Regions:
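Short beta-strand to alpha-helix junction loop
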Residues: 18-30, 57-66, 113-135, 142-144, ...
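An anion/pyrophosphate-binding glycine-rich loop and adjacent beta-alpha core
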Residues: 217-291
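Helical element adjacent to the flavin cofactor pocket in flavoenzyme catalytic cores
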Residues: 110-176, 374-387
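Central beta-strand plus flanking loop segment that forms part of the substrate or channel wall
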Residues: 1-5, 196-223
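Flavin (primarily FAD) binding-site architecture
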Residues: 179-195
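C-terminal catalytic lobe of FAD-dependent flavoproteins
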Residues: 104-117, 125, 260, 264-394
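Helix-loop-beta segment of a Rossmann-like dinucleotide-binding subdomain
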Residues: 44-56, 94-137, 158, 294-298, ...
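Dinucleotide-binding Rossmann-like beta1-alpha1 core, especially the glycine-rich loop
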Residues: 1-94, 251, 263, 271-272
């Protein structure tokens, strides 16, 4: 709705196809959650999803012209209803009072486009509710376990699991394995000998944020606000100032700031990166390093950016920000996937979420980061189609029960889009006037 990376400008025209594709996939997530709410699996939707307006922010004439063209394109599309646009300082100050404080509107013009259809999602709470439901249905959940190896053994996969507390190991055999191990997914797929990931590499990037719980500030910023990347800057460099709701408590987060650690998981090993380097993926690493100097420069700058430097970045959004109100928090660890490419590039950065499976459909995994969790149900539908295609006809009724628009194009079917939107808004408790700009 507001991320400008998904609506690039090409030869003076705004391409909204990626934004439409991601929006369509996110609607499947909303349908899946709504189905689970109606069936008692998710018992408290407002614990994980809350209405929060989404805003796109432009600074300077070039960005304003881009944002105006983007707004015109999205406002005419049924998948982005009730989009609004303003470039006067009075509306800006009314909608974003915190960001207007200390701002010299005469020195640099600004503009915003916004929609009240946005949400804030706490995926930790969502995951917790799914696990609670699994336990209620008799599922035993074992924590402190790490999959250390996956090997083919006849018609089965032999999965080695280690108890991280005792060191004891257990072997589980399965006909199908799904690898949803975050930053460790690529390593496990490589250990399994999946040829589809030959030459793949991963580069870890940590995320840091400035956070404030000062309610005097929080109450003046009831939105997620995304800006535009500087010319030549990588997509992950785009900062945003967000209202977040966690366990019912509102906070503001600004970032992300890129950090660097060789770990592939937040609690991983400092040897993760070095152990992942193999003969087949060295060209991928070298190719990306040589052809993505902007990314290398960005990471170096971010690693050496101190607290005052982080606050200086915040000043672009909130000019009157005082560092005393903010603290640095370390978020998760993401592994940027590097895909092998032909000469002369050798390696390319993959910025989306990729589903990888072997040709027999017996093992699959998810690689990549953004948009990540928000489109997981759509990724799992794709997995079913790839790996269990012979069962899809038998499973059709159940899939349509869980995803009423499964098989339909929400990009083309406005009536279907509107119907599912009304249903999910009501079921998820989002049909409210609270938190609107």
């Amino acid at each position: 709705l507001c991320e400008l990376n998904y609506t690039p400008e090409k030869k003076g025209r705004i391409d909204v196809s990626k934004a439409m594709n991601i929006n369509e996939k996110f609607q499947l997530s909303r349908q899946f959650w709504s189905y689970q709410v109606e069936n008692g699996v998710l018992t408290d939707p407002r614990a994980f999803i809350n209405p929060v307006p989404h805003v796109s922010f432009a600074q300077g004439e070039d960005q304003i012209n881009y944002l105006r063209k983007r707004y015109d394109k999205l406002a005419a599309n049924h998948m982005f209803p009730n989009m609004q646009f303003a470039e006067d300082r009075e509306t800006f100050a009314e909608k974003l009072p915190l960001m207007s404080q200390g701002r010299d509107f005469d020195a640099e013009p600004v503009a915003i486009s916004w929609t009240n259809a946005g949400t804030d999602i706490n995926y930790g709470s969502l995951t917790g509710q799914f696990l609670d439901a699994a336990k209620r249905n008799g599922t035993e959940i074992r924590y402190g376990r790490e999959v250390t190896n996956i090997k083919r053994e006849g018609n089965f996969w032999k999965v080695t699991v280690k108890n991280v507390h005792t060191g004891d190991k257990q072997v589980v055999r399965a006909r199908f394995v799904f690898v949803g191990a975050g930053g460790y997914a690529l390593d496990l797929l490589r250990k399994a000998g999946v040829p589809e990931v030959h030459g793949y590499a991963g580069f870890p990037i940590s995320g840091m944020w400035l956070k404030t719980d000062n309610q005097e500030l929080v109450q003046q910023h009831k939105a997620k606000v995304y800006g535009k990347a500087k010319v030549g800057a990588p997509p992950m460099s785009v900062p945003h100032l967000d209202l977040r709701v966690v366990d019912g408590k509102e906070s503001l987060l600004f970032g992300p700031y890129g950090g660097w650690s060789p770990k592939f998981l937040k609690e991983g090993s400092y040897l993760d990166l070095f152990k992942s380097i193999r003969l087949d993926n060295i060209p991928s690493y070298l190719g990306v390093g040589a052809t993505n100097l902007a990314l290398v420069k960005y990471l170096v700058q971010e690693v050496f950016r101190d607290f005052d430097g982080k606050v200086d970045m915040l000043h672009e959004y909130y000019p009157a920000a005082d560092g005393k109100d903010w603290e640095v928090v370390v978020a998760g660890q993401r592994v940027q996937v590097i895909k092998p490419a032909a000469f002369p590039r050798f390696g390319t950065l993959e910025f989306g979420t990729a589903l990888v499976n072997d040709q027999n459909g017996t093992i699959a995994g998810v690689l990549g980061a953004s948009p990540g969790a928000s489109i997981t149900p759509a990724a799992m539908i794709e997995l079913l189609e790839r790996c269990f295609g012979e069962h899809m006809i038998d499973w059709g009724d159940k899939l349509h029960e869980m995803f009423p628009t499964y098989g339909k194009s929400l990009k083309r079917d406005e009536a279907a889009y509107d119907e599912q939107w009304a249903w999910t808004q009501k079921t998820l408790g989002l049909d409210t006037d609270e938190n609107t700009l």
